[in-house]
């Protein structure tokens, strides 16, 4: 995992020194690792039992920070389907809004129609609007029948 601190450094703004939790999920197995962040840019390595399906940075929202952590669509789809992580689902939808493939539109449509949290459904509707293709339009129109 590569971590960059992007704040503009100066006399009153310095590098953060913090323990940052990174969570890896593969099936039902959850592995938490701690990255001790202290430099402008650092790479961290974690021993895992297999390829993770989901990777979450600061999953407990310990730090007040703007985290940009782009993930491949496959991981975002898995994160969107994780019933235990409501905020993770919202974050996945926000990233999926930049993808226009049929699989992603289908996953967003499913979230729009079935997610138990209204905030995820709202973000899914916004994402489909941003995707702005025929499949997304069809998904939005179908959702008006809820």
Give residue ranges: language-model regions:
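Extended amphipathic alpha-helical coiled-coil/heptad-repeat regions
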Residues: 133-146
